A protein has these predicted regions:
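Rossmann-fold scaffold of SDR-type NAD(P)-dependent oxidoreductases
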Residues: 27, 105-115, 133, 151-159, ...
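Rossmann-fold cofactor-recognition segment
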Residues: 71-89
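A glycine-rich helix->loop->beta "capping" turn
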Residues: 74-79, 97-110, 116-120
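Glycine-rich NAD(P)-binding loop of the Rossmann-fold in SDR/ketoreductase-type enzymes
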Residues: 86, 128-136, 211
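Conserved Rossmann-fold cofactor-binding substructure of NAD(P)-dependent oxidoreductases
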Residues: 86-102
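Catalytic loop of short-chain dehydrogenase/reductase
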Residues: 114, 118-122, 127, 153-232
């Protein structure tokens, strides 16, 4: 473990006797897991800290922010920001604004997704789903990585489906050891194949979620490979997380058994335990982490039941 010095358990880095307020940002945060992550940060961070709740719908973002700010357990300041993560320029502007105003950010959780359902052709949903989940991940990693303060946390919410074993072995070399530029190229090639109707012949699953999640984890691994040495020296964590099965409208169409599913608040708790830990386990750096444990990058088997839903 690498110990990172915090001030009196408040989740704040301290320099000498001076405590620096922390800046946290969560994307896709007006509902579901993202909202619960903001709630949890607001409750667990200090009164001088700032949590930014972001999303692309101004009205929903403002309403969600008011609800968190008014909650009895909220300790930190909570503000709303409109941010469409599929717009890379908008993400870059947000990062630059926070860098100029606050000297960087301490916690960034990339959580935004677009809902995908089995009752519509996957090709009709591909552009929005890939643009938000993968384009958003790439933009957040590129823009917020450089403004992350020492000891910070740059986290991408992915899934246990994000390990290579969930893909056809023919596709593994496309992601294994890839740079971020290469991951982006693979994602665009896959998107084009989905629209051309050739994706399945190339080995891609029908269900968009699987390649999307693998690409998210590959993107995190690519960025982490470049930063690892410097980040581990100052206690900075770049990682992907799997929150486990969460009972949300996004998950409901794809799974049958929700008997062990978590509420968004329950799922957020484990994610925030990692984010707010005062010690960094180097084994988690650049990896996909579920409930504090690393999921092997080459693990998993291709899911069948979800693709079968798309046969009807």
């Amino acid at each position: 473990m690498l110990n990172f010095r915090w001030s009196h358990g408040s989740g704040l880095p301290s320099v000498g006797d001076v405590t620096t307020p922390r800046i946290a940002l969560v994307t896709g945060a007006n509902q579901g897991l993202g909202f619960a992550l903001v709630e949890g940060l607001g409750a667990r961070m200090g009164p001088d800290d700032l949590v930014l709740l972001t999303g692309r719908n101004a009205g929903r973002v403002a309403d969600a922010t008011l609800r968190v700010a008014a909650a009895a357990g909220t300790r930190s300041r909570v503000e709303d920001r409109v941010l469409d993560v599929s717009d890379a320029d908008a993400v870059a502007r947000m990062a630059a604004e926070l860098d100029e105003r606050y000297g960087g950010v301490d916690i960034v959780i990339s959580n935004a997704v677009a809902r995908v359902t089995p009752d519509r052709p996957q090709s009709e949903q591909a552009d929005e789903a890939i643009g938000v989940a993968n384009g958003g991940t790439h933009a957040v990693l590129r823009s917020f990585g450089p403004v992350l303060r020492p000891g910070g946390r740059l986290i991408v919410v992915a899934s246990s489906l994000g390990t290579l074993g969930h893909l056809d072995p023919r596709l593994h070399p496309l992601f294994d050891g890839a740079t971020l530029d290469e991951v982006e190229q693979v994602v665009e090639s896959w998107r084009a194949a989905v629209h051309a109707g050739t994706a399945e012949a190339q080995g891609w699953p029908r269900w968009l979620n699987v390649p999307s999640k693998v690409a998210q984890v590959a993107a995190v691994r690519a960025v982490a490979a470049e930063r690892r040495a410097a980040d581990l020296c100052d206690g900075t964590l770049v990682a992907a997380v799997c929150p486990g099965l969460v009972d949300t409208p996004t998950s409901r169409p794809w799974f049958d058994d929700f008997s062990r599913a978590q509420t968004p608040s329950e799922a957020a708790g484990a994610v925030l335990d990692l984010v707010l830990s005062d010690a960094l386990d180097p084994a988690t750096y650049g990896e996909l982490v579920r409930f504090g444990r690393v999921l092997p990058w080459h693990g998993g088997t291709p899911p069948r039941s979800q693709d079968e839903l798309l046969n009807h």
